[in-house]
């Protein structure tokens, strides 16, 4: 789970941003 520690925050933020864009479309 080292990758989750390194990339988790940024990847999760990007994914949430993408979901919000789709939800607002």
Curated annotation (Swiss-Prot):
Sorted UniProt keywords: ATP-binding, Chaperone, Cytoplasm, Isomerase, Nucleotide-binding
Location of the protein in the cell: Cytoplasm
GO cellular component: cytoplasm
GO molecular function: ATP binding; isomerase activity
Domain of life the protein comes from: Bacteria
EC number: 5.6.1.7
Catalytic activity: ATP + H2O + a folded polypeptide = ADP + phosphate + an unfolded polypeptide
Complex and partners: Forms a cylinder of 14 subunits composed of two heptameric rings stacked back-to-back. Interacts with the co-chaperonin GroES.
Function: Together with its co-chaperonin GroES, plays an essential role in assisting protein folding. The GroEL-GroES system forms a nano-cage that allows encapsulation of the non-native substrate proteins and provides a physical environment optimized to promote and accelerate protein folding.
Similarity remark: Belongs to the chaperonin (HSP60) family.
Name of the molecule in the record: Chaperonin GroEL
Species annotation: Delftia acidovorans (Pseudomonas acidovorans)
